[in-house]
Amino acid sequence: MSRQFAAQGLRSLSFVAFLCASTILGAAQSTDSFAFVLPSYLQGIGSNPLTSDDVFDIFHSKEPMAKSTTKVPMFFPASPPAVYPNEFRRIDGSRNAPGDLGRAGSVDLRNTTIGYADGSGTPGGATRKGAREISNLVNFQTAPIPNSVNVSGFVWNWGNIVDHDMVLTKVAQPADHFDIPIPLGDPVFDPNSRGGLFLTLNRSSALFVDGVRQQVNSNSAFLDGSVVYGSDKQREKEMRTLDGTGHLKTSDGNLMMFNVNGLPNQPPPDRGLDPGLFFLGGDERSNENLALSTMQNLLVREHNFWADFIKIGDPTLDDDGIYQRARAIVGAEIQSITYRDFIPILLGPNALTPYTGYNASVDPRVSLAFSTAGFRVGHTFLPPVLNRLDARNRSMGDVSLNEALFRPQLITKLGIEPYLRGLARQIPQEVDVSIVDGVRNFFTGVGTGFDLAALNIQRGRDHGLPSYNQVRIDYGLVPKATFAEVTSNLDFQSRLASAYSSPDDMDLWVGCLAEDHVNGGLVGETMFTIFKDQFERTRDGDRFWYESYLDAPTLALVQQQTLGAMIKRNTSIASEMQDEVFHVPTE
């Protein structure tokens, strides 16, 4: 056998090697009702170990693509037994932090100076240029600018998952308009100089706390897998099979279920589209773009993989026992991959202080500086097209970014593999002030359209974020006196000077993107500081953080998992994709 099976860690096993290994390991070990038992395909059930056919059926009954060949490498974990505590996360994030901080429906953390014009709730920025005008002056991009450090599309894609796991800010109901003026003669949205046109924007939902308008986070603020499972019981129940398997529901092709019962989802029903045509995920934005939908589908498969793993190990568990254990592992995987792989790429190595355990005095809520400005860094990564590749990494035809929005039918047609292969091989754009036209100049009709850069600027004003320099002061940084201190790029200096009088006047999101990057990272000093603060609080203020919640064997099992392994055990993808998927292959 060319590859050996190891009882610890992940190994790329041929199907034959996997089956051989499943027949030679020892008998089951007894555990209590909260034990996570080594699956019986690895240890046998008493004197009656599973047959090869049993193993095949369990892991591939819903994987027709993987079933078509025995040459696909399998990425199955092996682990000693482990025991969970007798408590699982609540779906809405309640009973985690003192005062239920971080629970779905909580207000975001405002840890900066209030930037509202009246100090209470009137949007800021009234003395600055309009958001679309600034977008045209600063955020334009005339040609592709590939990232200089060889990261793959999985960096922005995984960041999208992390963002949607931690925060969802809905719009106000009834509508409270804060529309974006379109400059007269705008080359995209007003080429005939009609004038008086706007890009529609509704203010975010908010509550007044101590006389100040504060935005509401509809998701659990914890990095807890809510992007997969939801942040409310109704959504969670809708997605579960409740049939004894512990599974999440799937549709044809082992894809996510569709929103057949019309739960809150995007696009909203007022668009006149049948909600049953769109995937239903834990977060309402699961259909936002094809890359995001692809990862959401993968995480549903990952849950069902672990549910099967656990079910075989302990057949006495009921549906909820299986489901909660699988949910705990997937949530832990998301945390592990984010902090071990994703954050060091974004911020550089050793950016966060070492973890020392749960700290009840830490506020785990998402800060407005993070959600409204900082973590919108992903928008500058976006490429003009999404690559789709076949099993030999040949193009299957690119999809333009504006054609990749709310198009689940393109996944039902081809599956998730072409998009995963594309993300693995495609270098995203540089982190800078430039945004591709696909999301900055998305024209949908006279006087209507979409500009993601302008939206980000306007949303910062809606949320009462202070200026760039004020945020630097609030986070303990020295303010910048000139645009040359913000960026060494002469072109960017010129762009900023055309839009703002000084760094004191600059919108936070724009200033963050313009900065020179910190050594070893992809972002500038201000964004680095905002991210460091947020990710340390997210970790330290979570009572269920995987490094302190899981027992040692289960923790070791989770820490062995990688995004590459997750992809290869849940799809037909094999050696055509690199194992370390956050960087493109160097060959």
Residue ranges and their predicted role:
Residues 307-322, 463, 472, 476-478:
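N-terminal leader/propeptide and maturation segments of large enzyme subunits in energy/redox metabolism
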Residues 14-27:
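Classical Sec-dependent N-terminal signal peptides that target proteins to the secretory pathway
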Residues 31-305, 309, 328, 332-454, ...:
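N-terminal accessory/cap region of cofactor-dependent oxidoreductases and related radical enzymes
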Residues 322-328:
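Alpha-helical scaffold segments that form or flank carboxylate-/histidine-based iron centers
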Residues 481-499:
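Short linear, low-complexity motifs centered on an aromatic residue
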Residues 2-17:
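Bacterial N-terminal signal peptides that target proteins for export
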Residues 1-4, 304-307, 476-485:
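Short amphipathic alpha-helical segments with coiled-coil-like heptad repeat character
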Residues 317, 321, 337, 341-345, ...:
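Short, flexible/disordered secondary-structure transition segments
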